[in-house]
Swiss-Prot record:
Aquaporins facilitate the transport of water and small neutral solutes across cell membranes. It comes from Oryza sativa subsp. japonica. The keyword NAD does not apply. It is found in: Cell membrane. CDD domains: MIP. This is Probable aquaporin PIP2-7. Expressed in roots. Aquaporins contain two tandem repeats each containing three membrane-spanning domains and a pore-forming loop with the signature motif Asn-Pro-Ala (NPA). The keyword Phosphoprotein does not apply. The chain crosses the membrane at residues 45-65, 79-99, 128-148, 168-188, 202-222, 252-272. GO terms for molecular function: water channel activity. InterPro entries: Aquaporin-like, Aquaporin_transptr, MIP, MIP_CS. GO terms for cellular component: plasma membrane.
Amino acid sequence: MASKEEVAVETVEGGAAAAKAPYWDPPPAPLLDTSELGKWSLYRALIAEFMATLIFLYVSIATVIGYKNQRATVDACTGVGYLGVAWSFGATIFVLVYCTGGVSGGHINPAVTLGLFFGRKLSLVRTVLYVVAQCLGAIAGAGIVKGIMKRPYDALGGGANTVSDGYSAAGALGAEIVGTFILVYTVFSATDPKRTARDSFIPVLVPLPIGFAVFVVHLATIPITGTGINPARSLGAAVLYNQHAAWKDHWIFWVGPVIGAFLAAAYHKLVLRGEAAKALSSFRSTSVTA
């Protein structure tokens, strides 16, 4: 693993020509870095995560309530449909990651934060504080929606994630694991130092695939769970709706994303970045020398 003083060089082939793009491959984040608590940059990042998650919950939950309200009162063909809901979630994440990426990293999701922690990209201190800020922002965002449209909010489920009829808890858990894996895997790939160095002249290439990942996962899992893949989003809606239906299977929307995030981090580091092969090679070399 390169130190901050070392610069790795990647060769990028394009047609007949090859260009070299320098990139930083930062060392693993320390597990406990209490020095962060004395830095304004941490608190600025927490505010950014709080506000971004608040905005995300406001837009996404309002879209879900609006869609259900249209479906219940008028011809379903006049509503936004699953496609519109998925676009709302994906496009909002794209915008918010673009806006906050330079301040906090634009996580807006405890699963993303935990995935980066598992990948040694964040300290435990920053991870815990990010998750708290995201959950508080989600509750505030859902609260704004409920304040604006209280009657349809209460009547139409509050945008809370539930296991749909015809699906088992195990199936819903599997959908959440796979969906979160896709999202966090995309985050790791989009923010990989090699890729960002090569594509740094097109900054939109980082939030764009992340937004599309959210979009396609929603298309696949809205019929199953309403699509969680974000524990803060599920928590915010459940707290404000606060009915048995919202809490009955709420554990799925924490356990699934955490498992999916861990698997994505392991896949990226051990397979795509080749750390498993490097560790095995180092072990063999040590054994031969001994």
